[in-house]
């Protein structure tokens, strides 16, 4: 099955091609030949073939000598994709993914992402911040971004999720980041945004799921605390893992100190996951991911 999608019809000099397909000889040669035919220069390239001969994954960042429309390059690449039954996408390197941030009452991840974005080191276009609390309106306003306060109760959850999806659609949001948003989303919402919603879980999955993982870790006497960034699926905290991080601790750490240590890890792990997604480095492989050049 061949699939592709362009994000823009604008001309560009640099592009990122990502693809996956059944592994067989000749894939790299075919892609390289296509690039040579278009006088393209490979700036960066990574690839991975599953050891059992299953799927092949590739990401190529290349430039062309004259501005070219994405649609034109897509059309020319179609014959290569069809020959190898590729699922693929071509992105203009300068295009930034429209990203919506969501938060509840803990702002360390939100603050970190906004700071990186303001400093120019987070390669996304933030469309706004959604929260079920009004706590971070001032922080959001300081970055001159829209703040959407959507309270959630069991009775209002369907209406709140409808409002959320309306914001996503109206802003053409391509990525949603749950920066410690603590409401459990319905299966319907998870399915609609599958593959484009990232959550940070305050634990090194698959251990210590659910509420108060640091207290669970303290009770177990762990020597490491961590965080996991993963794509959201209808199965809670079971989505494909993008990135994980760890910090060494010892017996002297109280639950409160473990929380403080873990928050630093959470912010770093989430920022890396968002960056890799925005740079088109993360390719899905069933319930796993392949991160090329992360």
Predicted regions and their residues:
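Donor/substrate-binding cores of folate-linked one-carbon enzymes
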Residues: 133, 156-160, 171-294
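Histidine-anchored nucleotide/phosphate-binding helix
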Residues: 108-119
